[in-house]
């Protein structure tokens, strides 16, 4: 009789533990889905902003190149042009549509997001400095 009682209690504990593990797995998978959706939305917004910034920078670079193509440049102008060229190279290196679709299909990785933040931070700083210098010069 004691043996039956021990087996019954053990069975109840095991089934409660199994239900607990199953509930934990379900809540984790739901959390992963929500996190992936929010990251996808953030990435979409970032892509739109990056495309707009890239188009604006390309236009600015063309205008500056035309302005300084035939004229003499000061050291400051030369530095601004070097910064803009570096920014354009950085933006072009981010523009790989094949890799972007692969990343979307396999999910988002925190390392990739951190890498993009590390790239975009200095790029935006350089753009701000370059535009500030140009506005000072024009004004």
From Swiss-Prot:
Statement: the UniProt record of this protein carries the keyword Secreted: yes
Subcellular localization, as worded in the UniProt entry: Secreted
Keyword terms, alphabetized: Amidation, Amphibian defense peptide, Antibiotic, Antimicrobial, Cleavage on pair of basic residues, Cytolysis, Fungicide, Hemolysis, Secreted, Signal
Principal subcellular localization: secreted
GO cellular component: extracellular region
Propeptide: 19-43, 74-118
Name of the protein in question: Maximins 4/H3 type 7
Source organism per UniProt: Bombina maxima
């Amino acid at each position: 009789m004691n043996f039956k009682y021990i087996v019954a209690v053990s069975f109840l504990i095991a089934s409660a533990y199994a239900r607990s593990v199953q509930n934990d797995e379900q809540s984790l998978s739901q959390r992963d889905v929500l996190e992936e959706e929010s990251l996808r939305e953030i990435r979409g917004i970032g892509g739109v902003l990056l495309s707009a910034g890239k188009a604006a920078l390309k236009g600015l670079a063309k205008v500056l190149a035309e302005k300084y193509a035939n004229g003499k440049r000061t050291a400051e102008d030369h530095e601004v042009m070097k910064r803009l060229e570096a920014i354009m190279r950085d933006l072009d290196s981010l523009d790989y549509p094949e890799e972007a679709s692969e990343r979307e299909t396999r999910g988002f990785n925190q390392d990739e997001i951190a890498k993009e933040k590390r790239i975009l931070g200095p790029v935006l700083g350089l753009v701000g400095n370059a535009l500030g210098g140009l506005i000072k010069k024009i004004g």
